[in-house]
């Protein structure tokens, strides 16, 4: 695995008004890396969903007194983003069962209420991992200079040695 050329970390209060600042930072990083406008918009939506989930659910019992940590790993071929909170966690398998199955064949109308965020993250990003421990950590990766084929696999547009 290649080392990150740059590593950027932000911490913000778990309040909705700070999600926009995280989006602006992400937009600047992705633009500097050379992502297309459409990819930048996809990145912003996915990160907004992860941050909004942390704001709405992690610190509900504490009146949003916690913080959201966002880390950006800037690699030559990808951007890795980690959104983490130390608030209330949940069982990901139980949540997926509760929300029901979904696939690219489903329409937005077929998604359960509350299931759209994870669906969007998984659809817009190349890799998404959710870790539940003391809080929730969502790790997402978007590759640079790639094309998607119909089966959802990523095809690299450059040769590796």
Curated annotation (Swiss-Prot):
A UniProt-annotated Pfam family? HATPase_c_2
Please state the span of the N-terminal signal peptide per the UniProt entry: none
Example GO molecular function = ATP binding
Reactions catalysed, semicolon-separated, are: L-seryl-[protein] + ATP = O-phospho-L-seryl-[protein] + ADP + H(+); L-threonyl-[protein] + ATP = O-phospho-L-threonyl-[protein] + ADP + H(+)
Q: Which UniProt keywords apply?
A: ATP-binding, Kinase, Nucleotide-binding, Serine/threonine-protein kinase, Transferase
What Gene3D superfamilies does the record point to?
Histidine kinase-like ATPase, C-terminal domain (3.30.565.10)
List the NCBIfam families: PRK04069.1, rsbW_low_gc
Which family is this sequence assigned to?
A: Belongs to the anti-sigma-factor family.
Q: What is this protein called?
A: Serine-protein kinase RsbW
This protein's gene is called: rsbW
